[in-house]
């Protein structure tokens, strides 16, 4: 109901979320479990086979045990892997890192009022104190922990005053979570990308760095500032004034992740709590403005983006004869009447939701691929993390992993853990 809830849903398509231990309902039969895998085939292109896998943007070690063997099979027989963006291209990575900031000579002073700026400064100081307190609590005598906390603050939050409006908004939401609780393991999406590289599969990005950098095009700067103000209000009300409610604010995210792991994620969960900011919009004019912003954000992040992704997936599937294509994008893009699946069906594709009991049939002999598949997906110690972790050099500190920069866009690798 607050703008915070809306940003939660968006952030699940671009960034990270806190993960909880699996506590699935054992009564849910395996055949009913949603494994977030669909087969896609066009009658006129029988020599090509596509698989769509709905990912979640959390460390792969947190969800790996729950990933169905059918997903592993589909990846094993694939020749081509479609990802939201190519994170192995240096130019792309540099563009993603740079795009969140304003021009060199600009700061947030150019678009924030003095009053709002001071409120954000108070929040940032609270976060810095929290980081240092956490580090000291871990081991009071370990100066490296405290230094590590300082580095993380400087790297992730330190240059907040240079952020573009939309990225300041995303940053404020991210700060509602405990950065230190996040695993250093690669995200599931990045893990798949690294496995595809190791297997010498063809990798094709579905979106460009420019599209990832600018996920919201219909919302004006003034509207984003309006959203920032309400997010700041949420932070002040739920966290600064009531620290004990901090964990409550994260429950919806944890619930989404838990349902993903258990295969019980349903479409109506994405509309839980309304995804609205009108709780803090008291006047009639404010309520109308909040509603208009909500509509624009949903249109940009879900409807327009799903259509764009579906068209590109369609083009790739039709253009790769005798190939098996494995697409890994945020699971949220497969829900709703304007989903990627809906658009593909409207384009003549036969889309089938797969179950654990289904059998993946390769187009060609699977022997070579199966051998590699077993090494890739079972020998976790072989993961080369450095090649799939985006890092940024802080001006006065060591290099700190900037996993949260991975878009999704993701937006929303799509805001979200669920949407990329």
From Swiss-Prot:
Listed transmembrane segments: 401-419
InterPro entries membership: TIKI1/2-like, TraB/PrgY/GumN_fam
GO BP terms, alphabetized: negative regulation of Wnt signaling pathway; proteolysis
Record topology, Extracellular segments: 23-400
Top class in the EC scheme: hydrolase
Keyword field: Glycoprotein, Hydrolase, Membrane, Metal-binding, Metalloprotease, Protease, Signal, Transmembrane, Transmembrane helix
GO CC term (a single one): membrane
Cofactor requirements of the protein: Mn(2+); Co(2+)
EC number of the protein: 3.4.-.-
Cofactor mode of binding and number, as noted: Divalent metal cations. Mn(2+) or Co(2+).
Principal place of residence: membrane
Name of the protein described by the UniProt record: Metalloprotease TIKI homolog
Organism: Caenorhabditis elegans
């Amino acid at each position: 109901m607050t703008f915070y809830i809306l940003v939660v849903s968006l952030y699940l398509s671009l960034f990270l979320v806190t993960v909880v231990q699996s506590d699935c309902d054992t009564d849910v039969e395996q055949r009913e479990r949603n494994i977030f895998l669909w087969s896609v085939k066009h009658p006129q292109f029988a020599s090509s086979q596509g698989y769509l896998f709905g990912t979640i943007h959390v460390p792969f070690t947190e969800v790996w045990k729950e990933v169905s063997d059918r997903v592993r099979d589909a990846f094993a027989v694939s020749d081509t892997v479609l990802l939201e963006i190519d994170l192995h291209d240096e130019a792309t990575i540099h563009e993603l890192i740079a795009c969140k900031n304003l021009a060199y000579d600009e700061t947030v002073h150019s678009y924030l009022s003095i009053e709002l700026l001071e409120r954000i400064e108070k929040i940032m100081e609270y976060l810095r104190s929290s980081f240092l307190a956490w580090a000291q609590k871990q081991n009071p005598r370990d100066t490296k922990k405290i230094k590590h906390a300082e580095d993380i603050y400087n790297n992730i939050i330190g240059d907040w005053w240079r952020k573009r409006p939309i990225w300041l908004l995303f940053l404020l939401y991210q700060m509602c979570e405990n950065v230190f609780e996040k695993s250093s393991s690669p995200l599931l999406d990045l893990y798949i990308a690294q496995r595809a590289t190791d297997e010498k599969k063809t990798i094709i990005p579905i979106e460009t760095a420019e599209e990832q950098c600018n996920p919201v095009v219909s919302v004006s700067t003034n509207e984003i500032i309006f959203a920032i103000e309400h997010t700041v209000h949420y932070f002040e009300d739920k966290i600064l004034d009531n620290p004990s409610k901090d964990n409550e604010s994260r429950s919806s995210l944890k619930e989404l992740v838990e349902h993903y792991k258990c295969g019980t994620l349903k479409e109506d969960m994405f509309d839980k709590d309304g995804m609205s900011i009108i709780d803090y919009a008291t006047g009639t004019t404010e309520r109308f403005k909040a509603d208009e912003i909500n509509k624009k954000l949903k249109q940009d992040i879900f409807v327009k983006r799903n259509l764009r992704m579906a068209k590109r997936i369609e083009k790739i599937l039709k253009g790769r004869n005798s190939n098996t294509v494995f697409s890994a994008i945020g699971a949220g893009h497969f829900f709703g009447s304007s989903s990627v699946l809906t658009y593909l069906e409207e384009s003549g594709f036969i889309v089938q939701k797969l179950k654990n009991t289904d059998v993946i049939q390769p187009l060609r002999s699977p022997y070579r691929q199966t051998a590699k598949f077993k090494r890739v997906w079972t020998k976790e110690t072989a993961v080369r993390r450095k090649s799939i972790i985006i890092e940024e050099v802080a001006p006065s500190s060591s290099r700190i992993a900037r996993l949260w920069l991975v878009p999704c866009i993701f937006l929303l690798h799509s805001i979200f853990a669920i949407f990329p």
